[in-house]
C-alpha cells in the first residue's frame, strides 16, 4: 500500500534495531511511545536525529518519559497542547529542555462524510472503543440505562472491543441484562475504518448521538471522524478533546463521571426533531473549517516540512 514511498519491516526488536538503522544510515529515526526502541538506539554507531512522538494518553504508559537520558532524543512531537503538558509532567530532568513540537493528527476527510442513504430505525447512542476502564464502558451502560427510561425505543451500540477477553465480554452482556437494556443493545466488535462513515451516518440520520465516556484522550480521532460525518458528539471533558473544536449543540462536553448531565445532553439531542435539524445545519457549517485544519491532503506536507527542519536534511 505504501510502495514506492515506504518499505515495511517486521520483526525488529531491541536486539536487531540498532544494526538495522546503522546499516541503512537513516538521517532521521522516529520512535512512537516505545521504550524498547529507545533503548535499542542507545547502541547506534551512526548519528541520526532521533524524534520521540508521544501519542498515548494513558498515564502508566507515559512513565517511560521519566527514564529518558539526554541522548535518547533530539526532539519530541505530539498531537495536542494537552499532551505537551503531560510530556512536561513526566519527562526526566535530562530532557526537560528538549523542544516539544505540536502537530495535530490528520485524517482523510473524504472517508468521513454524511452518506445520504435511507437508514430506517430508532435513534442510536453510539459508543466506540476498547472494552476497558480507560474508555469506561460501564459509564456508557449506566448512561444508556438512564436514557432508556426516558426514551425506551433508543438503541445502544458499541463498536470495537474485538480483543476483549471472553470473561469480560460476558460481563458486558450481563451488565446490559441487569440494567434492562439488553433488547436494545448491539455490539459490533470490529468495523473497518473505511466503513465507519456509514456507521456515523446511520446514527446521524436516525437522530442519534456519539457518546464518549473516556477518562483521557491525547487527541480524539473518533470525535473528529464523527463530526465530519455529521454525527453529533456528547463527550467527557478530558484530555485534548476540548481542543478539537469549540463546543456547540453538536459537540457537548460534560464533567467526567457526571452521569446525570451526560444523560440529559443525550436526551436533548434524541428527543427533538427540531433540535436535530438545527444541529445538522450547524455541523454542515463547520465542516469546511474542520477539513482545512485536519485533512491529510492539506496538512501532511506540513508534517514533512517539520521533519525536514528537525532532521537537518
Model region roles, listed by residue range:
Residues 169-197, 202:
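Nucleotide-activated donor-binding/catalytic signature segment of Leloir-type glycosyltransferases, i.e.
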Residues 209-211, 232-235:
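Short hydrophobic beta-strand element within catalytic cores of glycosyltransferases
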Residues 247, 251-260, 267-277:
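Conserved acidic donor-binding segment of nucleotide-sugar-dependent glycosyltransferases
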Residues 77, 111, 116-135, 141-148, ...:
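Conserved donor-binding/catalytic core segment of Leloir-type glycosyltransferases
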Residues 31-36, 54:
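Short His-centered aromatic/hydrophobic patch
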Residues 61-67, 71-99, 107-109:
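A short, active-site helix/loop in glycosyltransferases that binds the activated sugar's phosphate group
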Residues 215:
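Aromatic "clamp/platform" in nucleotide-sugar-dependent glycosyltransferases that forms part
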Residues 271-308:
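A charged, aromatic-enriched C-terminal amphipathic alpha-helix characteristic of glycosyltransferases
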Amino acid at each position: 500500500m505504501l510502495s514506492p514511498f515506504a518499505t515495511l519491516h517486521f520483526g525488529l526488536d531491541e536486539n536487531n534495531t540498532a544494526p538495522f538503522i546503522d546499516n541503512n544510515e537513516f538521517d532521521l529515526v522516529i520512535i512512537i511511545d516505545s521504550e524498547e526502541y529507545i533503548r535499542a538506539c542507545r547502541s547506534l554507531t551512526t548519528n541520526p536525529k532521533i524524534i520521540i512522538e508521544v501519542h498515548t494518553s494513558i498515564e502508566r504508559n507515559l512513565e517511560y518519559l521519566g527514564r529518558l537520558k539526554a541522548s535518547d532524543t533530539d526532539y519530541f512531537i505530539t498531537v495536542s497542547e494537552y499532551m505537551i503538558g503531560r510530556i512536561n509532567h513526566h519527562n526526566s530532568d535530562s530532557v526537560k529542555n528538549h523542544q516539544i513540537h505540536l502537530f495535530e493528527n490528520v485524517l482523510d476527510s473524504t472517508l468521513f462524510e454524511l452518506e445520504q442513504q435511507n437508514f430506517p430505525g430508532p435513534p442510536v447512542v453510539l459508543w466506540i472503543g476498547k472494552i476497558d476502564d480507560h474508555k469506561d464502558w460501564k459509564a456508557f451502560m449506566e448512561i444508556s440505562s438512564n436514557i432508556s427510561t426516558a426514551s425506551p425505543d433508543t438503541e445502544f451500540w458499541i463498536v470495537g472491543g474485538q480483543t476483549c477477553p471472553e470473561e469480560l465480554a460476558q460481563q458486558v452482556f450481563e451488565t446490559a441484562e441487569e440494567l434492562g437494556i439488553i433488547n436494545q443493545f448491539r455490539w459490533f466488535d470490529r468495523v473497518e475504518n473505511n466503513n465507519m462513515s456509514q456507521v456515523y451516518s446511520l446514527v446521524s440520520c436516525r437522530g442519534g448521538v456519539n457518546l464518549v465516556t473516556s477518562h483521557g484522550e491525547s487527541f480524539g480521532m473518533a470525535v473528529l471522524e464523527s463530526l465530519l460525518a455529521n454525527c453529533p458528539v456528547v463527550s467527557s471533558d478530558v484530555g485534548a478533546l476540548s481542543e478539537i473544536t469549540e463546543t456547540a449543540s453538536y459537540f457537548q462536553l460534560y464533567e467526567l463521571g457526571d452521569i446525570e448531565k451526560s444523560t440529559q445532553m443525550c436526551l436533548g439531542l434524541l428527543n427533538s426533531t427540531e433540535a436535530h435539524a438545527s444541529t445538522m445545519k450547524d455541523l454542515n457549517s463547520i465542516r469546511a473549517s474542520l477539513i482545512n485544519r485536519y485533512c491529510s491532503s492539506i496538512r501532511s506536507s506540513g508534517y514533512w516540512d517539520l521533519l525536514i527542519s528537525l532532521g537537518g536534511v
